[in-house]
Regions:
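Early extracytoplasmic/domain-onset interaction patches
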Residues: 22, 39-44, 50-76
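Short, aromatic-rich amphipathic segments at membrane interfaces
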Residues: 171-207
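Hydrophobic secretory-pathway targeting helix
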Residues: 1-39
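Soluble, non-membrane globular domain cores that form compact, hydrophobic packing
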Residues: 12-24, 161, 187-188, 207, ...
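Juxtamembrane interface at the cytosolic side of transmembrane helices
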Residues: 1-8, 192-236
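Long, solvent-exposed extracytoplasmic domains/loops
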Residues: 60-172
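Alpha-helical transmembrane signal-anchor/signal-peptide segments
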Residues: 26-56, 189-194
Length: 236
């Protein structure tokens, strides 16, 4: 039962307008079939990409391993994957022997890491065709194969107590390989060049949250549903 018609009307108007705004946000009218949430997500991904370029740092880490030889055997999930993994390491100048799904890799660890950084930089710059031309198959799959094979190499290096090499590997994965893969296809945008867009998105998010909250508040207030502190019982 409505207790306060004015409060109820305000709440109803706020919630109905909120619903209309939500429908508009979820419509695919924000370019390339995106809705408002997709647009905002892409915008923030572009901003974060602009501050996630660690290629120079990764190159220094890779170069610190130049002249360090590794000779180890890892196992892929299938013989077909082993062949694809092998293309990565032969491209980095290593000698690779494949037997079924097992690969024995013998080569300069610095050159291997430098190849990974080079591929990651190409992906970060949305130039996947270069990586595809280098190995002859999908660039995302190639980067994923680097990552999967590195997990095996990481375990092998730990087993051999080559902890310095393992640490360098982990840093290159974190600072080059992962950003290259995750941000592939994302446009780079700097916050300094898009201050107005960022301010609008943050302000709208705040307004949208308050908008919904006040709508509920006035609606329930109009229905007589309020939150009050319980009265203290008088002591006898």
């Amino acid at each position: 039962m409505i207790r306060n018609a004015k409060s109820f009307a305000i709440g109803l108007v706020l919630l109905l307008s909120f619903a209309l705004c939500y429908i508009g946000m979820m419509s695919p009218n924000f370019g390339n079939g995106r809705n408002g949430l997709n647009y905002a997500d892409d915008m923030f991904n572009s901003f974060s990409k602009g501050s996630s370029n660690f290629i120079k740092e990764s190159t220094k880490i890779a170069q610190s391993q130049n002249g360090t030889n590794i000779n180890l055997t890892i196992k892929a999930s299938s013989a077909a994957d082993a062949v694809k993994w092998g293309k990565l390491y032969t491209g980095a100048g290593a000698t690779v022997t494949i037997k079924d799904s097992a690969l024995t890799i013998n080569g300069d660890f610095g050159r291997i890491l430098n190849s990974v950084v080079t591929d990651s930089e190409s992906m970060y710059n949305n130039d996947g065709k270069v990586v595809e031309k280098r190995y002859g198959y999908d660039p995302r799959e190639a980067i994923n194969n680097w990552n999967n094979s590195f997990k095996k190499i990481d375990s092998a290096l730990k087993t051999k107590s080559q902890f310095k090499e393992e640490a360098a590997l982990a840093k290159v994965v974190q600072k080059a390989l992962e950003p290259g893969y995750n941000y592939y296809g994302v446009e780079i945008k700097k916050v300094s060049d898009n201050k107005s867009s960022l301010a609008f998105l943050l302000s709208f998010y705040l307004l949208y949250t308050v908008w919904y909250g006040f709508g509920l508040y006035y609606l329930f207030s109009g229905l007589g549903i309020t939150v009050t502190k319980p009265k203290k019982k008088a002591e006898v």
